[in-house]
Amino acid sequence: AVRNARNAPPKYSDHVETKMITPNMRLYEPKGSQDQRLPVLLYLHGGGWTFGSINSCGRFCDALAASGKMRVIALDYRLAPEHPYPEGLDDCISAVNYIIDHAAELHIDVNHITIGGDSSGGNLALATALSETCRGKIESLLLFYPVTKAFDDGSESWKQYGKGFGL
């Protein structure tokens, strides 16, 4: 039930076209931009690596694409525990390669690829950008409260919140 709580498809704006370009990737593009080569943001949803979907970040992706300045691709990467590490990360790396390989048909400027995400999605975005396969292919990162460490570092935050449910 928790996994499906944030999985309802969102209502999209009238300024954006959406379509599934693969079984696990949704493209958001500004209406009327189909022939323009635009930068792209590959967005990875949060959810503790165990829940969430491309629907849980749909409204955000739609709003970014509605700005008219970029295409956004949301990825439905494989979730733990059914798909242990590094399967989700492998999906992210494969998505970057897909974007590059299909840039012409998607009207994407391969010199302006951004990868981003929130929470665990931010972690995957950072790990993807740092991967040997993707290093040098990604221009920028858009990270919202990314998980960058998960160990007792002695900080006040860890002392106060380090026990119990982490996410």
Residue ranges, per PLM feature:
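N-terminal targeting or regulatory segments adjacent to alpha/beta-hydrolase or S9 domains
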Residues: 1-8
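Alpha/beta-hydrolase superfamily serine-hydrolase fold, recognizing
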Residues: 8, 13-167
